[in-house]
């Protein structure tokens, strides 16, 4: 196994391409600053994406590695802590004292509370949690989330919003206003993406699939799930390695169950998986047109 080396004593792994993961990493950076190595990681990671953990202080945020990997790392690292909230990972890591789960909080909120105990979370973290748990209970969450999705899912984006938060209500009001204007455009994109949906068989389940940019995957997936006879919608994202899958179900645990069959996991109604190139071609061989009823 080929892994990268770092001179830093702290390694922070976090869920890549995810605003919740970025928020968790930002919370860690507020504590460790440049003393830590921040490494985004996804379920289709390769060994060369990882750092050698021997003698390091290791944190895994809004993400979990397989149990076999963590059981090796705990013997090599100076310390190891996993903070996650994905149901499939919780089931797989049951009994590991260094793996902490809270299904009622997002990864960003868990990281903030873990690294800054007793300090109220910034609004940007509260908004990230509100969307990640798909609650939308806070005023402005939809608008701010829409604005943030025009930027990369990164620590810098979270930090930029935090600076506006510190600047006061007027500065945040500008971001909310921009987000409100963006929401109409997002809905148009969702409508366009769902209009291209097709049926396909994925691990024995007939699902509705389409492609779209990752920024609107949750909205499109949820829309597909409502249209799908199996109540499952899948967003396919292609790369040179294969296809990433954002899976959504209209209630229940269908998304998570299917994601686990695709090497991933997540929550009951929202999860992610992966297909290599050969598996993706097999999926496409089963594709048929879809016409909404």
Where are the predicted features?
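Glycine-rich, Lys/Arg-enriched anion-binding loops that position phosphate/diphosphate groups
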Residues: 133-217
